[in-house]
């Protein structure tokens, strides 16, 4: 009998992507996050679909429709908690996935890396518009503050902000269009994921050593399907623990109050996964400058391949670059902490120093470290 998975036009694509795919024999658990992100996306789309069946995108009923989902819909509380905490798991996996790419030099597959950065931006946009939908206090004021940043763009800013709002402030039109965006974007993300995988399979996976693994490849199934299954179990354990035991621990208490344009919360802040960028935005006392720094903090990932100066691809055998990488990690954690603090001393100066260090590490210190390591590894007479 002819093996169907090797002959059927559709099964053949799946076979070459997930079953008979030649994979390096030495890839570590840091390579699990790609498949985990795929699982997160599927969980978010499925839970989101069921939430959309009961949600109403109207300023008068949005908040109560979310309450209705949690109180009256069968397992609605679970679906909502999985969706809200699934977003946190999604971003945790995303940050670890990007960090792995930087540490092991995966960014030198430029097409895959660039699509990945576009994916990151798209997921961030999706999460932002999704956070507005429950129409609580922090949803409303978060939407107001972030969309207001568009007005910092010279000449067209105010017109652009009002165009996004569909009026002169965040209101019914804004909520309706944000729901439309939040529904369509995950499907765009799915398409981009396919392009991401297409480019990845053109070159094959990188590996911890950073050297060409062509001489030693193994089939993806069963070796890495089993390895990914372990990661999946851990992901589901953490997600279910969060959703069942502590579903509101990552949310903001202000979002339990319905949106009120007449009452501003004392501290407006986004979800934890945006706090690092929010801290960079706040560290510059100029509106346009802050917006540019905010954009630069994410878009800087696009130029990382151009800043690679080392002769070795991976940081595995580069202790100076490793040290700088972990300083960058600690710096991002510091920025995340600062983003959640009120705008007062000493948090202002800590945020400004951490923001300067963030850009200095990526643009100056890491390329210099690569050049220094090249020099140290040159044979001396």
From Swiss-Prot:
Say if the entry is tagged with keyword RNA-binding. Answer: no
Which GO molecular-function terms appear in the entry? metal ion binding; ubiquinol-cytochrome-c reductase activity
Entry binding sites for heme b b566: 97, 196
Cofactor comment in the record? Binds 2 heme b groups non-covalently.
Q: Where in the cell is it found?
A: Mitochondrion inner membrane
Keywords linked to the UniProt accession: Electron transport, Heme, Iron, Membrane, Metal-binding, Mitochondrion, Mitochondrion inner membrane, Respiratory chain, Transmembrane, Transmembrane helix, Transport, Ubiquinone
Q: What is its main location?
A: mitochondrion
Superkingdom is Eukaryota
Show the SUPFAM superfamilies listed in the entry: a domain/subunit of cytochrome bc1 complex (Ubiquinol-cytochrome c reductase), Transmembrane di-heme cytochromes
Q: Which cofactor does it need?
A: heme b
- Transmembrane stretches, start-end: 33-53, 77-98, 113-133, 178-198, 226-246, 288-308, 320-340, 347-367
Q: Which residues bind heme b b562?
A: 83, 182
Print the miscellaneous field: Heme 1 (or BL or b562) is low-potential and absorbs at about 562 nm, and heme 2 (or BH or b566) is high-potential and absorbs at about 566 nm.
Query: What task does this protein carry out?
Result: Component of the ubiquinol-cytochrome c reductase complex (complex III or cytochrome b-c1 complex) that is part of the mitochondrial respiratory chain. The b-c1 complex mediates electron transfer from ubiquinol to cytochrome c. Contributes to the generation of a proton gradient across the mitochondrial membrane that is then used for ATP synthesis.
Q: How does it assemble?
A: The cytochrome bc1 complex contains 11 subunits: 3 respiratory subunits (MT-CYB, CYC1 and UQCRFS1), 2 core proteins (UQCRC1 and UQCRC2) and 6 low-molecular weight proteins (UQCRH/QCR6, UQCRB/QCR7, UQCRQ/QCR8, UQCR10/QCR9, UQCR11/QCR10 and a cleavage product of UQCRFS1). This cytochrome bc1 complex then forms a dimer.
Protein name in the entry:
Cytochrome b
What is this protein's gene name? MT-CYB
